[in-house]
């Protein structure tokens, strides 16, 4: 089972709101998921990002692959740097 960390779209039409979720790569975008890691609201100025850092690092260390957008969000929050440092043993 390949696990991905990706965005699940919520909110009304033309007013998107996303949950950052851990899901099986075979499940649909807005379908079944394993766990919610955070939220992302691109409509708010500035864009609002809330991520549970512990959960995100746990899933990255377990082998979950983040989507491109989630990788960018994690990088802006400093999570990817912490993950790489932990992986290299620093």
UniProtKB/Swiss-Prot annotation:
GO CC, one annotated term: cytoplasm
UniProt keyword annotation of Ribosomal protein present: yes
Keywords: Ribonucleoprotein, Ribosomal protein
MF terms (GO), sorted A to Z: structural constituent of ribosome
Superkingdom classification of source: Bacteria
SUPFAM superfamilies for this protein: Ribosomal protein S16 (SSF54565)
Keyword Signal: no
GO biological process: translation
PANTHER family, per the entry: 30S RIBOSOMAL PROTEIN S16, SMALL RIBOSOMAL SUBUNIT PROTEIN BS16M
Record-stated family: Belongs to the bacterial ribosomal protein bS16 family.
Protein name in the entry: Small ribosomal subunit protein bS16
Organism (species): Bacillus velezensis (strain DSM 23117 / BGSC 10A6 / LMG 26770 / FZB42)
Gene: rpsP
